């Protein structure tokens, strides 16, 4: 399995997913890698968190594409219009329809990567490590 470098303290990922099971699954993977995890169950909660003081802690956002209300694309577009760290934080789309997803549309919205569900541990850790610059 892929292991993060020695300098992995204070690493933090925000998981945005309306499905409790999916959030817990990814959270367990990341916590096994000594990564702090923040959770949001919808787009508005994610935006609220990214506008709070806790935003400074967040290195990467894992964004579910299909959520009730605001989907992942819409949420990302709003995040990218905000000031401060929100504009820069890497956002990785998570989707069960990996092969049908338009990568160009994700990039245009401001997303930095795509991970298919079910989540592969090594792929997840590699993507996060690369985008966070750890």
Model-assigned labels for residue ranges:
Residues 1-134:
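C-terminal compact regulatory domains
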């Amino acid at each position: 399995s892929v292991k993060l470098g020695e300098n992995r303290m204070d690493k933090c990922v925000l998981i945005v997913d309306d499905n409790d099971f999916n959030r817990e699954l990814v959270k367990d993977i990341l916590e096994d890698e000594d990564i702090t995890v923040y959770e949001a169950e919808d787009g508005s909660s994610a935006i609220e968190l990214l506008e709070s003081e806790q935003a400074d802690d967040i290195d990467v956002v894992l964004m579910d594409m299909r959520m009730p209300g605001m989907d992942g694309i819409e949420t990302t577009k709003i995040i990218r219009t905000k000031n401060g760290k929100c504009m820069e934080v890497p956002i990785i789309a998570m989707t069960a329809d990996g092969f049908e997803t338009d990568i160009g549309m994700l990039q245009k919205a401001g997303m930095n990567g795509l991970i298919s569900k079910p989540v592969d541990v090594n792929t997840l850790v590699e993507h996060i490590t690369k985008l966070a610059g750890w």
